[in-house]
Amino acid sequence: MFSFKRNLWFLTLSLFVLFQSSNVFPQNSFNENQIKDFEKIIENWIEKNPKKVKQVLDKLLAQEEKNHHNKTFEMLSDHSMDPVMGNPEGDVIVYEFFDYNCGYCKSAFNTVIKALDKDKNTKLVLKELPILSQTSINASFFALAAKKQNLYSEFHTKIMLFRGRLTDEILFRMANQVGLDIEKLKKDIQSDEIKLTIEKNKILAERLNITGTPSFVIGNIIIPGALNEEQLLKYIKKVRNENS
């Protein structure tokens, strides 16, 4: 978002460019002294018309916020690289930002699964956001590599139900348990696609002002923190009703 001083500067510059580019004056018709005089006229006008200046700045801010919002949610809706659970064709999408070392995320796991079981028309998009430690990053890379073998859900569930330190040894053991091809897994962990997916999620989290996990986005609603089953189903119903 623009600061007030930046907006003031932007307004002044916009007025100057407007006059410079208008057909009223020939191209390059201002000399240095005229430009200084013109800047002084603008400064005086701004000082004498603070309400009008505020109105213009408010409009600029509103448009900037709208553009930011639209671009962010457009970016969010492009989730082709993210894992999906629930109904892939669901009429309501729940985005969950989580970290595998987040205790609240693990507590919320059963809540989310139960909600998906009760509401069969909800699509869950899982946004890997490893922000707590290096083991969080490693776990996310393993999980997204498991997606390439169509075993993300199984591997994700294993990690979410695990209590303890997520060492690589533990992650490889889980990979074996769910039937992953270990050699392919090792290769896929190095893929640029996985790096880009996680980087995009971090950018999205920043744009959405998400600073912790778990966080949910349902419709245009951003919900920080864990939800109980009733709360989650209530948000889903609310968004569904708004969309109908």
Task: Show the residue positions of the predicted features.
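N-terminal targeting signals for export/organelle localization
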Residues: F2-F10, V17-F73
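C-terminal cap of thioredoxin/glutaredoxin-like
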Residues: F30-Q34, N176-S244
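Soluble non-cytosolic domains of exported or imported proteins
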Residues: E32-K36, E47, G103-K106, S133-I137, ...
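Surface-exposed patches in mature extracellular/periplasmic domains of secreted proteins
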Residues: P50-D58, E154-K158, K184-D188
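A short beta-strand-turn-helix
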Residues: M75-V92
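Envelope-exposed proteins and targeting segments
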Residues: G90-I93, K120, G219
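Structural alpha/beta surface segment adjacent to cysteine/selenocysteine redox centers
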Residues: Y95, Y100, K106-L180, K186, ...
